[in-house]
Amino acid sequence: MKIIKLEKQMGDFHLNIAEMNLEPGLIHGLVGANGCGKTTLSKLILGILSPDSGTIDYEGLTARDITMTSQKPYLLHDTVYQNLIYPLKIRGIRPDEAEVDRWLSRCGLLEKKMQYARSLSSGEQQKLSFIRALIFEPKLVIVDETLSNLDPDSTELFEELMLEQQKERPITWITISHQLVHIKKICDKVHFLEKGMQIAEGTPEEILLRPEHPLIQRFLANTEVSYQKQEQSLADLS
């Protein structure tokens, strides 16, 4: 997928992506401070928003090939099972019951298959939302802050699922996260946004470990200070 001269004005915010290459089959990380345009860009890619100008070359992908998971799981008022097979039903795909059970078992939800989704914990709802996005074998998955409120075990599970799917078939991932440990661990390529513009792209090592751009250096320094304050607060509580 290639983005060229993409612009979107929303109030005082102006997204202006001169060029961005989202190579197929890779895990791409969108990084930057709050309000830099990460979610706006993802909505433009999904077609939820229309650009004011510029182009997104999907290189053969259609809306049926693209899906998204977000920080808030949007689930049907129905059972876990019906939620999971919903993407299959709307695409006219007959559910493979063994495959459905495999996904549920992988996330520890098999015994809750016929329970209503609203009875699940918030973490379990997030797991259900995540595997629902994968069950129909999409070609592009956008993960928008899905991991932000998860415990370490659930975060590790999601990362394992992403890497497993990457090996099984060539999915293109776009993951948006403030968890730089996650970005460093799982991404093939990082795109750094600042005030609606992409100011750098490269490997996690190039962007997050050896950044040349002063704005990225400052962002990483501020992030490190924030982490240190959190650790000190936890130490004070213990």
Provide a role label for each language-model segment.
Residues 46:
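Helix-to-loop junction immediately C-terminal to a conserved catalytic motif
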Residues 177-178:
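H-loop/switch region of ABC-family ATPase nucleotide-binding domains
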Residues 183-185:
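A short, surface-exposed alpha-helical micro-motif characterized by mixed small hydrophobic
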Residues 31-33:
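The feature captures the beta-strand-to-loop junction immediately N-terminal to the Walker
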Residues 116-120:
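Conserved ABC ATPase signature
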Residues 97-112:
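Conserved ABC ATPase "signature" region
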